[in-house]
Amino acid sequence: VYKDKEYDLSEETEKKFLRYHSKKGLERRKALYAYRHAEQNSWIYKTLLEKKKLPLFKKCSKLLLVGSGLYPYSLFDIHKKFKHIKMLGIEIEESRYSASKQLVEGGPARDKIKILKLDGIDFDYSRLEDDDLVFISCDVDSDDIYKKVLETSKAHVYICAPYNRQWMKDSIKKSNLIYDKDGRIISP
């Protein structure tokens, strides 16, 4: 009885309620987990770090990542460090777009990060200003997109990939793996 009205909660209704809310809760938990455990100092950050241009993040108001992928961990990493930046991930492939959008919309960065299903060449970069940043994933065929950004916008544009491979060499040394002269692992 609630407000003088009697409700009959059948077992079937209760199961539907629990099934709906457990799935909704699961999506939220996945999104929070993805946000919290996103790689620190990911590719976007490393790209500017290696070029010694980290101060660009402080002045930036909009950041775009072309080829944001299945899991936009780089955008999550930047959101944790620079809350003032509005970010946009552009992804062309439907399944990666859907998964990425679900992670963003269920997490704490949903007001600052948006994911679009679009080819990077079709995006209008003309509204970007001097302090804005565009990163193109190394997985994307970047030549045409790079030219378009340079021709139509004032934004800084970078290919989001390591330029200096020293971090990779350091990681390999820390792994304690032994390699033969052909680069194959010979001991765990």
Model-derived features: positions:
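S-adenosyl-L-methionine
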Residues: 1-58
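C-terminal substrate-binding/active-site "lid" region of AdoMet-derived donor-dependent transferases
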Residues: 143-188
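A short SAM/SAH-binding and catalytic strip from SAM-dependent methyltransferases
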Residues: 131-146
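Conserved SAM-binding loop of SAM-dependent methyltransferases across substrates and taxa
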Residues: 70-83
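Conserved SAM-binding motif I beta-strand of class I
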Residues: 86-91
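Conserved class I S-adenosyl-L-methionine
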Residues: 59-71
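Conserved SAM-binding loop
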Residues: 100-101
